[in-house]
């Protein structure tokens, strides 16, 4: 009987902890903000995709994702950034 009580207790605690973890992640879902911009050259051939940060962020940014999965925060007003976005959009169309 003791192993059954222990199993019930472990199941209850595990369920409660998973619910707590899920609730904590839910508060920031979809909210990724850039604190600073990348100032180096943008490696066009290594870019996979891009997205714009949320309006809730204090700094507007374009985030490029490389083929290695690295995120690069970029200034949306920068000419190189605009060219990189156009490049990726042209790849999507073809």
Curated annotation (Swiss-Prot):
A single Gene Ontology MF term assigned here is: signaling receptor binding
Query: What induces it, per record?
Result: In monocytes, up-regulated by IL4 and by GM-CSF/CSF2 in an IRF4-dependent manner (at protein level).
Xref: Gene3D superfamilies: 2.40.50.40
**Gene Ontology cellular component list:** extracellular region; extracellular space
Role summary: Chemokine, which displays chemotactic activity for T lymphocytes, preferentially Th2 cells, but not monocytes or granulocytes. Therefore plays an important role in a wide range of inflammatory and immunological processes. Acts by binding to CCR4 at T-cell surface. Mediates GM-CSF/CSF2-driven pain and inflammation. In the brain, required to maintain the typical, highly branched morphology of hippocampal microglia under homeostatic conditions.
| Disulphide-bridged cysteine pairs | 33-57, 34-73
User: Which keywords belong to this entry?
Assistant: Chemotaxis, Cytokine, Disulfide bond, Inflammatory response, Secreted, Signal
InterPro entries hit by this protein: Chemokine_b/g/d, Chemokine_CC_CS, Chemokine_IL8-like_dom, Interleukin_8-like_sf
The answer to whether keyword Glycoprotein applies is no
What Pfam family is a match for this entry?
A: IL8
Q: What is this protein called?
A: C-C motif chemokine 17
Location in or out of the cell: Secreted
> Which family does the record claim for this protein?
Belongs to the intercrine beta (chemokine CC) family.
Say which domain of life the source belongs to.
Eukaryota
Cite the PANTHER family for this sequence. C-C MOTIF CHEMOKINE 17, SMALL INDUCIBLE CYTOKINE A
| Signal peptide (UniProt feature, chain positions) | 1-23
Name the organs or tissues of expression. Answer: Constitutively expressed in thymus. Detected at lower levels in the lung, colon and small intestine. Expressed in stimulated peripheral blood mononuclear cells, but not in resting cells.
GO process annotations (BP): cell-cell signaling; chemotaxis; immune response; inflammatory response
């Amino acid at each position: 009987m003791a192993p059954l009580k222990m199993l019930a207790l472990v199941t209850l605690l595990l369920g409660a902890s998973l619910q707590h973890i899920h609730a904590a992640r839910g508060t920031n879902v979809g909210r990724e903000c850039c604190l600073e911009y990348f100032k180096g050259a943008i490696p066009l051939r290594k870019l996979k995709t891009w997205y714009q940060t949320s309006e809730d962020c204090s700094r507007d940014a374009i985030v490029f994702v490389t083929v290695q999965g690295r995120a690069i925060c970029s200034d949306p007003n920068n000419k190189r950034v605009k060219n990189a976005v156009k490049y990726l959009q042209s790849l999507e169309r073809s």
